[in-house]
Amino acid sequence: MNDMSRVERAVESKQTKMECRDCHVYYGDTHAIKNVNVDIADKTVTAFIGPSGCGKSTFLRCLNRMNDTIAGARVQGSFQLDGEDIYDKRVDPVQLRAKVGMVFQKPNPFPKSIYDNVAYGPRIHGLARNRAEMDEIVEKALRRGAIWDEVKDRLDAPGTGLSGGQQQRLCIARAIATEPEVLLMDEPCSALDPIATAQVEELIDELRQNYSVVIVTHSMQQAARVSQKTAFFHLGQLVEYGETGQIFTNPEDPRTESYITGRIG
């Protein structure tokens, strides 16, 4: 059995949203991601887990070409969204990031009003013809971000004035305002308290009804709670990928078991 046969365990059949093949990432001479092959299922939460420095965030950034913004980064391989190569020279990275949104580790609302934070992307992409349409887009995104009821009477207030948990939900609303197909989340709860974390986790479960969600997390408990599929990265390699319950209860690779049981990390 070759390495890919071990990684590509049988998983529940679901339409593939993104297909990644023979993927490598280099930072200068450093080979950060080594021959990763993975399919991201539609309307599913996929968790990337692994020790610090294992490459999970680097690989996540490949999925919407955020590594393009890092000096010296070089990406090789095939990354397809609905069968289309996202690294094709004809693809506009800005347009791609409207389809593949991202939420970062630390809440980063713009220094604008709550309304303008959410309206920012739709304005850039010309999604509203008038104020009424923009109002509808903003309300829909804030509702899906599970924060509408908390901010509907103060949309002109600065987004930076919200609590940490509210700011992160605002950033999620901002990311989904452009109606993406995939939502990437890089440690979205690491800066939040337990109550705010629970709110975001509940929101993630709701979001998968409409989007493919990929989340990087250092918390194995969080991965087990929110995801249906889990990928374990170690030293730049995808070691194992499969159904979350199977990965956590009966992993095939001893390195996965060692990480889950705390022997490596």
From Swiss-Prot:
Residues 18-260 form the ABC transporter domain. Part of the ABC transporter complex PstSACB involved in phosphate import. Responsible for energy coupling to the transport system. It is found in: Cell inner membrane. This is Phosphate import ATP-binding protein PstB. Its EC number is 7.3.2.1. The keyword DNA repair does not apply. Belongs to the ABC transporter superfamily. Phosphate importer (TC 3.A.1.7) family. One of its GO terms (biological process) is phosphate ion transmembrane transport. Keywords: ATP-binding, Cell inner membrane, Cell membrane, Membrane, Nucleotide-binding, Phosphate transport, Translocase, Transport. It is an enzyme of class 7 (translocase). It holds the Pfam family ABC_tran. It comes from the Bacteria. The gene is pstB. The complex is composed of two ATP-binding proteins (PstB), two transmembrane proteins (PstC and PstA) and a solute-binding protein (PstS).
